[in-house]
């Protein structure tokens, strides 16, 4: 494969920096909603996708090469790894590969296809806790026990959370909101690309 299809050192630095900015924005966006579980689930992740859509468009227009789509979710996933959420990191590592595969074969020449990895990233972000409870419930119970809870109390605590995180209607709302706002963010970024980024020579 032609070497120009891969990120060079300068582009790698740009992607790493902007991916870190996306992660920081996601964390800051969630802070005002931290006390309200419903707003975190239904709104915070979509808002992060909306705001980060502008940065994402700039990123993929400046660095439309193999490696870009892998790095974006991996950086976000590493945050979860460092904070002890190993399973969520694993989800984002898988998504990093999926997003990269989606963009192979001329994906960056399309105006539509780049929106898919962006939407998937923030949809997965909305589903992090849901998937962890669904797939690794026993491990969660054991983590509560390790913190000093007895097994019955730990199981009851997880069960109380499952009623919210695993409710089908809540999952549907969270996914729809994250997808819609992320796509809106991408569309806003594309609009700004023509009006501001290109005239300014940024992209």
Task: Identify the role of each PLM range.
Residues 12-17, 46-47, 69-74, 89-90, ...:
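Hydrophobic alpha-helical transmembrane segments
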Residues 18-29, 48, 52, 56, ...:
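Alpha-helical transmembrane segments of multipass membrane proteins
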Residues 92-130, 186:
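Short helix-perturbing small/polar motifs within transmembrane alpha-helices
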């Amino acid at each position: 494969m032609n070497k120009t299809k891969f990120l060079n050192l300068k582009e790698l630095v740009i992607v790493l920096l902007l991916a870190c900015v996306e992660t920081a924005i996601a964390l800051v966006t969630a802070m005002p909603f931290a006390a309200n579980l419903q707003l975190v689930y239904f709104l915070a992740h979509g808002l992060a996708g909306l705001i980060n859509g502008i940065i994402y468009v700039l990123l993929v227009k400046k660095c439309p090469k193999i490696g870009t789509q892998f790095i974006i979710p991996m950086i976000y996933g590493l945050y979860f790894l460092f904070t002890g959420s190993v399973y969520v990191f694993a989800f984002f590592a898988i998504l990093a590969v999926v997003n990269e595969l989606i963009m192979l074969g001329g994906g960056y020449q399309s105006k539509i296809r780049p929106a898919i990895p962006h939407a998937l990233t923030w949809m997965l972000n909305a589903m992090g806790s849901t998937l962890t409870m669904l797939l690794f419930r026993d491990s969660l119970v054991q983590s509560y026990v390790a913190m000093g809870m007895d097994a019955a109390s730990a199981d009851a605590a997880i069960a109380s959370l499952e009623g919210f995180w695993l409710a089908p209607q809540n999952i549907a709302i969270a996914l729809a909101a994250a997808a819609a706002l992320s796509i809106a963010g991408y569309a806003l970024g594309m609009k700004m690309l023509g009006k501001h980024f290109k005239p300014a020579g940024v992209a």
